[in-house]
């Protein structure tokens, strides 16, 4: 009988190669790895160069997410610059039209990105020309930006150049909407509160102080009378069910005064006086 072949395949024996051949292989592998890493570095630098061409003067940042209403973007000069070519073009346009119109120009700017607030806007748009007044619309309760603002320039020509240059300009992931407002549409209260730091109204503090304010005797009597009337109706209903309830509401005892700091008292008085 013939012997059955074992199911286990025999592994190929490794051929012993001379040391010189192994050294050459190692050198070739190292050169190949170095070439791949250099190629990847060149590709990355090309992508960065393209980004700079399309978006001059802006850097990419991962900190542009909305986290808190008071978060600010990087306002360094490198990020806020328009770029040499754009700045030359703008100055040329302004110099061509500077003798035409001397009246002021008002610009509407919409779709403002998160973190691009009054300080950043003044820094940015001052590159075009002197900014006289600037007001960004904010929520009265929270103080959050409504993402649009009004800017008054010294010259109407500058405002026209800004509207032409910056309309649909990509800024921190948002396309700016710029439009010159005609003089007859500029409202007298459009710049009310401009260049004044926004102060959030402390609604919680005001409500707490109003709640903790001691009641007058007349108001306390009124509250007790109303509560006793409701309690009387409840007693009648419980009596029909066979339950007797003996209780009444009277004037509470005067609470002992709690010692508080003078500074907090003064602060609370100022808060109440400012928002009456």
From Swiss-Prot:
Biased composition regions of type Low complexity, renumbered to the chain: 252-261
A GO BP annotation: assembly of large subunit precursor of preribosome
Cell location: Nucleus, Nucleolus
UniProt xrefs under SMART domains: RRM
Name of the protein: Uncharacterized RNA-binding protein C1827.05c
Region annotation Disordered: where it falls in the sequence: 1-70, 249-276
CDD domains: RRM_NIFK_like
Keyword tags: Nucleus, RNA-binding
Native organism: Schizosaccharomyces pombe (strain 972 / ATCC 24843) (Fission yeast)
């Amino acid at each position: 009988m013939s012997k059955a072949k074992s199911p286990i395949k025999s592994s190929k024996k490794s051929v012993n190669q001379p040391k010189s051949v192994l050294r050459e292989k190692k050198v070739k592998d190292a050169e190949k790895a170095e070439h791949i890493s250099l190629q990847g570095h060149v590709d990355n630098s090309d992508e960065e160069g393209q980004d700079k061409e399309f978006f001059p003067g802006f850097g990419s940042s991962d900190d542009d997410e909305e986290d808190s209403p008071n978060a600010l973007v990087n306002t360094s000069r490198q990020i806020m610059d328009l770029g040499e070519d754009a700045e030359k073009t703008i100055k040329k346009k302004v110099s061509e039209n500077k003798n035409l119109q001397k009246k002021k120009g008002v610009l509407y700017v919409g779709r403002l990105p998160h973190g691009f607030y009054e300080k950043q806007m003044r820094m940015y748009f001052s590159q075009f020309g002197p900014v006289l007044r600037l007001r960004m619309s904010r929520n009265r309760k929270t103080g959050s930006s409504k993402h649009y603002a009004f800017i008054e320039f010294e010259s109407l020509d500058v405002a026209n150049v800004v509207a032409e240059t910056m309309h649909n300009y990509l800024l921190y992931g948002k396309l700016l909407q710029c439009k010159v407002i005609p003089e007859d549409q500029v409202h007298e209260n459009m710049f009310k509160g401009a260049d004044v730091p926004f102060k959030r109204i402390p609604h919680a503090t005001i409500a707490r102080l109003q709640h903790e304010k001691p009641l007058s005797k007349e108001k306390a009597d009124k509250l007790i009378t109303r509560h006793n009337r409701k309690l009387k109706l409840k007693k009648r209903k419980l009596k029909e069910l066979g339950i007797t309830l003996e209780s009444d509401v009277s004037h509470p005892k005067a609470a002992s005064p709690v010692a508080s700091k003078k500074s907090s008292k003064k602060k609370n008085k100022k808060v109440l006086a400012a928002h009456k």
